[in-house]
């Protein structure tokens, strides 16, 4: 089946199998490897991308579901002016180590900052619950996001 979508601001038209996952489409068909495969059950957040501005787990989202949508991967976010702010905050607060979770984390945080939902420490924790990090212990991540959101 043919799908047409925008990926990181570029129009893409491709044939996909009905069962092809968005994660596989991005990685295998488009060579965008920032979204990572890890749990395959929407738990870890490593595969997070934005579809029409909202974070989705691309490991459980069909490529066909993205037909007509705007998909943003970490590669696309890195081209945006706001990426530098995210990168600086995560670096300043030592919010990353191995980096495996970082693309999904940054995409989630970007969408949440844009929505204005991050107004308390508890809200930050709730919103990041779908993004697991095995290295940092979360303190630096929570500090970076609080800094970005202006939450004390």
Where do the model's predicted regions map?
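Signature of N-terminal electron-transfer/Fe-S-associated modules in redox systems
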Residues: 1-152
């Amino acid at each position: 089946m043919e799908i047409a979508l925008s990926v990181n601001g570029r129009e893409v038209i491709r044939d996909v199998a009905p069962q092809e996952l968005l994660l596989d489409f991005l990685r295998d068909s488009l060579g965008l490897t920032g979204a990572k495969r890890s749990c395959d059950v929407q738990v870890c957040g490593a595969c997070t991308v934005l579809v029409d501005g909202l974070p989705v787990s691309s490991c459980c989202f069909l490529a066909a579901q993205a037909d007509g949508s705007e998909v943003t991967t970490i590669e696309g976010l890195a081209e945006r002016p706001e990426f530098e702010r995210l990168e600086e905050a995560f670096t300043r607060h030592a919010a990353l180590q191995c980096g495996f979770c970082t693309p999904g984390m940054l995409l989630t945080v970007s969408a949440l900052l844009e929505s204005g939902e991050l107004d308390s420490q508890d809200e930050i924790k709730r919103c990041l619950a779908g993004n697991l990090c095995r290295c940092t212990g979360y303190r630096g991540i929570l500090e970076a996001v609080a800094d970005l959101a202006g939450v004390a």
